[in-house]
Amino acid sequence: MDESTRSKLLTLFEGKLTRAMEVYLETCSRCGICTPACHAYASMPRARYSPAHRAEVVRRIYKKYFKAQGRILPGWGQAKPLDDTAIEELKEAAYTCTGCRRCMMYCPFGIDTQQIVSIAKLLLIGAGAEPETLTMLADMSVAKGQNVDAIKPRFLDGIRRLETKVLERWKSESAHPIPTEVEGADMLYVALAGAHSIVPAAAVFNAAGENWTLSFFEAVNFGAFVGDPAKTKLILERIVDEALRLKVREVVICECGTAYRVMKQLSGKQPFSVSSITEVHARYLREGRIRLREKGITRPVIYHDPCQIARNGGVMDDPRYILKKLCADYREISPEPNYNWCCGGGGGLVALGEETLDFRMKSSKIKADQIVAYGKCKPEDNAILATACENCHTQLGNINTHYKLGLDVQFLSSMVADALVE
């Protein structure tokens, strides 16, 4: 690594050094309490998968260049130079962490390893060593926001074709069961690309008599996955600007954990509220705006709490409220939602597909064991494993196949739509 590259990377590092970040970097006592809290370490007990080790990869560079002792005494506190070897270590640290923050729940000092790992991801971007796939997906999202008028006709053609599928689930008096560009709508729904994220949601909104409109943009924020703050902001602002232009009162995010957390926590103070679709479904049930076949699902049902929606987003009671309405045999797994095991698919790992599949399956053994231990399901039970996150759904499907669990992995929103009654 040449000096100009190193200097550029250290400038990026320095830009992340808020007071909170400095506390995280300087507080660790090496107590090790966080170590067994990580799903990767619990599944594969190797030191390099401990949260403290991941943080230490970043911390040693911090000591070398941002602490007087490290500059004067190069060997102090295992201070380490930022070089090509360090970049490889940063890459492993960054992309074996899903950002689930389970370790933070156990840390006596509340050190946020995910925030420390965000430095690693930013340095990788600066060095051109980040996963190319994630950067490409983030760039495509940014480009879509800059050329929305060009994609509108094709998007609307696709939406009109989906409307017949919505009507198969719930009859609508509206000319368009999937409304778009409705200024003054109460709700802007931000979906993912694909019928599975649009059709069930539209059926439930129409059943509730909602005044809603569909966003032109998909919810997922690939800028957040790759750890690029500028692209994260650009992708987020597409939706914020659309919501402001349409003067909606609420932005509802589909079953996508990172999309929900980014919109909820990073959009700043806005004239609209932000909700997950799970919160909206629970609200409809409490207000009597929709009716479901109560206890109509007789198969055993287990629920996986997505980390970004539950532990990092606070949505824990609503999915259980819905499931206890839907299911005759709902089985709670332990530990409780704040301490639930991560599925192992977050942080961009699922988006990397086959590239990360082997690691994802090995690191998710603790999740598979948790499901078996508390679900108490036999393959012949045809039990349902429900979740409210696209990444989790994909990862849990992979886990189900890899560990031969014999489960039927479903989206919670689809279960609600399937159970609608007049």
Language model feature labels by segment:
Residues 15-25, 55, 59-262:
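Iron-sulfur-cluster electron-transfer modules
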Residues 284-327:
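C-terminal amphipathic alpha-helical segment
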Residues 36-64, 105-124, 348-364, 394-405:
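Iron-sulfur (Fe-S) cluster-binding segments and ferredoxin-like electron-carrier domains
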Residues 28-34, 38, 97-103, 107, ...:
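Short cysteine clusters
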Residues 14-32, 83-102, 245, 330-340, ...:
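Immediate flanking context of iron-sulfur cluster ligation sites
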Residues 110, 191-273, 310-323, 331-422:
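Cofactor-cradling patches in redox/metallo enzymes
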